[in-house]
Curated annotation (Swiss-Prot):
UniProt family annotation: Belongs to the aspartate/ornithine carbamoyltransferase superfamily. OTCase family.
Binding sites annotated in the UniProt record for L-ornithine: 168, 232, 236-237
Coiled-coil residue spans: none
Function text: Reversibly catalyzes the transfer of the carbamoyl group from carbamoyl phosphate (CP) to the N(epsilon) atom of ornithine (ORN) to produce L-citrulline.
Entry keyword set: Amino-acid biosynthesis, Arginine biosynthesis, Cytoplasm, Transferase
Source species: Haemophilus ducreyi (strain 35000HP / ATCC 700724)
GO molecular function annotation: amino acid binding; ornithine carbamoyltransferase activity
Sequence positions that bind carbamoyl phosphate: 57-60, 84, 108, 135-138, 274-275, 321
Catalysed reactions, as listed in the record: carbamoyl phosphate + L-ornithine = L-citrulline + phosphate + H(+)
Main location: cytoplasm
Name by which UniProt lists this protein: Ornithine carbamoyltransferase
Taxonomic superkingdom: Bacteria
Length: 334
């Protein structure tokens, strides 16, 4: 079946086929090699891209900006403090304004409905840099990183997500594994597993791709022989301190420790994290949590010993955000 990614949105990967996702991964690999070898060709000269950030970011902003500059495009960074978005102007109107000035729009914020609305009214490609529900650019980077760190073909790679699986990382890792025919395992307390509607959708994708999906609260079942362990933060800034205790107590068995890595039975298992990670109490929020919960002074979702070990490939993930985002922009705009 022929496909065309020209002028395509990237909103969640729900509407991307297995072949389209694999094409983006192959393009990202090629662009990465070209950058490393100094042979990269600029294909986005004259393009202008708006970067809307309702949520702050380090990796997403830097990845989009560097990827755009590498390809000859110009970007404009827009945040709530420097625009009328959400204050005096609706997202619908913002989309119709920016769509007349820019060739594409990136959005990083809260509701998936917001990025969908942008895509509906902008008239230009819209790329989801993160919403509460999905994180598609991170998924492309994660799969590229797994391919680079495993000699198995894609359909034989196994990975598990540990922790609060109701968030964008749990949702997105379930989705992309189902799309690509991988062995994907979601491991969380029953109260923190993905929504049934998403699970049903991903099971349908898995039937088409021959993916293996395991959703469980049984840690030993989920991690057995796995190639990669993913996790994400358990708490977010702005959440009331009193709500942390119940969730932390629920998630403590799912903390990524050396013992948990060993329980996989795979001496080559790798650790992955979308970052930022609370692996010690050196940050402001890490200190705040450690004061309230002293048992977490050496890390929350992952402890320092794992994070600083050779098993950690999270910084390769972070770099691959740039290469995969570049692939998305080139495929859509070049």
């Amino acid at each position: 079946m022929a496909f065309n990614l020209k002028n395509r949105h990237l909103l969640s990967l729900v509407n991307h086929t297995e072949r389209e996702i694999k094409y983006l991964l192959a393009l990202a690999r090629d662009l990465k090699r070209a950058k490393y070898s100094g042979t990269e060709q600029q294909t986005l000269k004259g393009k202008n891209i708006a970067l809307i950030f309702e949520k702050t970011s380090t990796r997403t902003r830097c990845a989009f900006e560097v990827a755009a500059y590498d390809q000859g495009a110009q970007v404009t960074y827009i945040d709530p403090n420097s625009s009328q978005i959400g204050h005096k102007e609706s997202m619908k109107d913002t989309a119709r304004v920016l769509g007349r000035m820019y060739d594409a729009i990136q959005y990083r914020g809260f509701k998936q409905a917001t990025v969908n609305e942008l895509a509906k009214y902008a008239g230009v490609p819209v790329f989801n840099g993160l919403t509460d529900e999905f994180h598609p650019t991170q998924m492309l980077a994660d799969v590229l990183t797994m391919l680079e760190n495993c000699e198995k073909p894609l359909n034989q790679i196994s990975y598990v997500y540990m922790g609060d699986a109701r968030n964008n990382m749990g949702n997105s890792l379930l989705l992309i594994g189902a799309k690509l025919g991988m062995d994907v395992r979601i491991c969380a307390p029953q109260a923190l597993l993905p929504e049934d509607s998403l699970v049903t959708l991903c099971q349908q994708f898995a039937q088409q791709s021959n993916a293996r999906i395991t959703i469980t609260d049984d840690i030993d079942l989920a991690i057995q022989g796995v190639d990669f362990i993913h996790t994400d933060v358990w708490v977010s800034m702005g959440e009331p301190l009193e709500t942390w205790g119940e969730r932390i107590n629920m998630l403590m068995p799912y903390q990524v420790t050396p013992a948990l890595m060993q329980r996989t039975g795979n001496p080559n298992v790798k650790f992955m994290h979308c970052l930022p990670a609370f692996h010690n109490s050196e940050t402001t929020m890490g200190k705040q949590i450690a004061e309230q919960y002293p048992q977490l002074a050496n890390g929350i979702e992952v402890i320092e010993e794992v994070f600083e070990s050779s098993a950690n490939i999270a910084f390769e993930q972070a770099e691959n955000r740039m290469h995969t985002i570049k692939a998305v922009m080139v495929a859509s705009l070049a």
